[in-house]
């Protein structure tokens, strides 16, 4: 800990420095005088008043005098009101017992207001569930957008089961962010997912402009390969063929966990910035209907709500909450525990680490993240790791399962029904072309990640558990006390434990145990509440 500054700095300085400052001040004042002389002196304009030639001069003067008197009376009245308010506050100073009763009465009167405010403000998670149900009911085809870096972890069995039970609806998987995984891994995942559902390789465009500025700056835009959309033609062909087979206008719903790129897929299909996109999770709060053409309409939806019964890694990657709510050290440590250590060291250019706390310390020193006093800011390093892993720049990948085992809500008959009506051979050719066009990540930007499997979500708003206001306040007070007791201890407890043991010397092993005398003194003090110095020290 840095020692506090007990003395103020001395104002003594060398004569050279003092004369230099005085000279600069004189020069500055001289320049100001020179500029003021150039501008000239302007006399303030006096109010000429009401001219004698003006009609109703006396009436105007009387009105002005009346307004002046009214302002004076208003000031006097405000002064009296302030004095009365101060007098009332002095009389309210009563005994502590009466004050306690006043506080209780005030709390009782505030209780109906709290209930009314709570009833008026609905839980946003429940609103998300309601909007998701609306999107599924209104859709003929449901596009489940998956992150190609962890496709299995982005699948929600509850949503897929709801689509299957609806009867005539189709479900299509969209592997977005396909440029962030190696091509071999992408092909393996495509073969695995195609056994269940039609899967489209996709890479959303990042070169879209706003509607108003798109036409103006169209000629100046130079499209790079990383900004070009891949898989748009395959998805358009799939939707168009299904619309022709139905013979009617269709609606396509887009669902998925936060930050998988649902709105980016819609913007890429429309070739305009229609839906709001960004780095933050959960930007889309309600369903948004976007017409793609005369026959096809696409519906954007809010993100899926993850169930709290999932693994810590899934909660860290797919919770639509800020990093402060998730606790940065816990979230980043859970992610780091599933990543390959050697590739993490190569990506972040840090030495080998023993545990997550050691890694965050080295990363903070490497990136120049320091607290007051020069100690490494471990929490900022954890936030940096979390933002990179939940963003769209880091290239990590997972291996698909060795063999395909259908889940409880899926079997071969359902898979055949979902594939019916689509030209799968043409889809396979389009996917192969998209993989060939894509440019995979660099070798130093590839990190092997162990997926935690399917991620459970919440579709029914009744399953969302709400905390009472009293529990929330108690929780906040407990957190404040924890933070006050010691930030360092809290940080160490949040991180995964170190799997390292060392032998203690006899002196160290007995250092933590209280001596017999001290324990006897503690027992005596506990038995007798009245503390007598004469018996203990004389």
UniProtKB/Swiss-Prot annotation:
Residues 129-307 form the CP-type G domain. Residues 277-451 are annotated as: Intermediate. Residues 460-532 are annotated as: Acidic. InterPro entries: G_CP_dom, Gnl3_N_dom, GTP-bd, GTP-bd_ortho_bundle_sf, P-loop_NTPase, TRAFAC_YlqF/YawG_RiboMat. Residues 1-45, 114-126 have a biased composition (Basic residues). Signal peptide: none annotated. Gene3D superfamilies: 1.10.1580.10, P-loop containing nucleotide triphosphate hydrolases. There is a cross-link at residues 91, 177, 248, 262, 270 (Glycyl lysine isopeptide (Lys-Gly) (interchain with G-Cter in SUMO2)). PANTHER family: GTP-BINDING PROTEIN-RELATED, GUANINE NUCLEOTIDE-BINDING PROTEIN-LIKE 3. Belongs to the TRAFAC class YlqF/YawG GTPase family. May be required to maintain the proliferative capacity of stem cells. Stabilizes MDM2 by preventing its ubiquitination, and hence proteasomal degradation. This is Guanine nucleotide-binding protein-like 3. It comes from Mus musculus.
């Amino acid at each position: 800990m840095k020692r506090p500054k007990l003395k103020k700095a001395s104002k003594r300085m060398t004569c050279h420095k003092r004369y230099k400052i005085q000279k600069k001040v004189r020069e500055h004042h001289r320049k100001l005088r020179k500029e003021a002389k150039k501008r000239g002196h302007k006399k303030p304009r006096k109010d000429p008043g009401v001219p004698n030639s003006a009609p109703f001069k006396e009436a105007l003067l009387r009105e002005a005098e009346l307004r002046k008197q009214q302002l004076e009376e208003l000031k006097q009245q405000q002064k009296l009101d302030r004095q009365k308010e101060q007098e009332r506050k002095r009389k309210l100073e009563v005994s502590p017992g009466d004050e306690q009763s006043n506080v209780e009465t005030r709390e009782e009167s505030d209780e109906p207001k709290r209930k009314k405010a709570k009833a008026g403000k609905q839980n946003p998670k429940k609103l998300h569930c309601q909007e998701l149900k609306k999107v599924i009911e209104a859709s003929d085809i449901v596009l489940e957008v998956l992150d190609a870096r962890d496709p299995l972890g982005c699948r929600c069995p509850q949503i897929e089961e709801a689509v299957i039970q609806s009867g005539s609806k189709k479900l299509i998987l969209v592997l977005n962010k396909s440029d962030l995984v190696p091509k071999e891994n992408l092909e393996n995942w495509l073969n695995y997912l195609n056994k269940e559902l039609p899967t489209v390789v996709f890479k959303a465009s990042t070169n879209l402009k706003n509607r108003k500025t798109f036409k103006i700056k169209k000629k100046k835009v130079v499209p790079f390969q990383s900004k070009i959309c891949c898989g748009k033609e395959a998805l358009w062909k799939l939707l168009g063929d299904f619309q022709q087979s139905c013979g009617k206008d269709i609606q396509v719903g887009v669902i998925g966990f936060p930050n998988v790129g649902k709105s980016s897929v819609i913007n890429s299909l429309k070739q305009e910035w229609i839906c709001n996109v960004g780095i933050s999770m959960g930007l889309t709060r309600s369903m948004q209907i976007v017409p793609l053409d005369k026959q096809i309409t696409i519906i954007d939806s809010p993100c899926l709500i993850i169930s709290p019964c999932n693994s810590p890694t899934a909660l860290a990657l797919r919770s639509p909450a800020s990093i402060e709510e998730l606790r940065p050290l816990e979230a980043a440590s859970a992610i780091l525990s599933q990543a390959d250590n050697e590739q993490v060291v190569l990506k972040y250019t840090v030495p080998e680490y023993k545990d997550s706390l050691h890694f965050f310390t080295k990363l903070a020193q490497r990136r120049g993240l320091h607290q007051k006093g020069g100690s490494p800011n471990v929490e900022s390093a954890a936030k940096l790791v979390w933002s990179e892993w939940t963003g769209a720049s880091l290239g990590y990948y997972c291996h698909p399962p060795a063999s395909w085992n259908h889940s409880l809500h899926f079997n071969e008959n359902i898979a055949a029904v979902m594939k019916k009506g689509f030209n799968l051979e043409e889809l396979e050719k389009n996917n192969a072309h998209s993989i060939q066009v894509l440019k995979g990540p660099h070798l130093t930007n590839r990190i092997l990640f162990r997926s935690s499997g399917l991620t459970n979500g919440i579709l029914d708003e009744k399953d969302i558990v709400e905390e009472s206001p009293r529990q929330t306040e108690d929780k906040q007070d407990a957190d404040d006390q924890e933070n006050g007791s010691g930030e360092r201890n809290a940080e160490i407890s949040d991180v995964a434990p170190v799997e390292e043991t060392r032998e203690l010397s006899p002196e160290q092993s007995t250092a933590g145990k209280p001596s017999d005398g001290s324990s006897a003194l503690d027992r005596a003090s506990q038995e007798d509440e009245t503390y007598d110095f004469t018996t203990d020290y004389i």
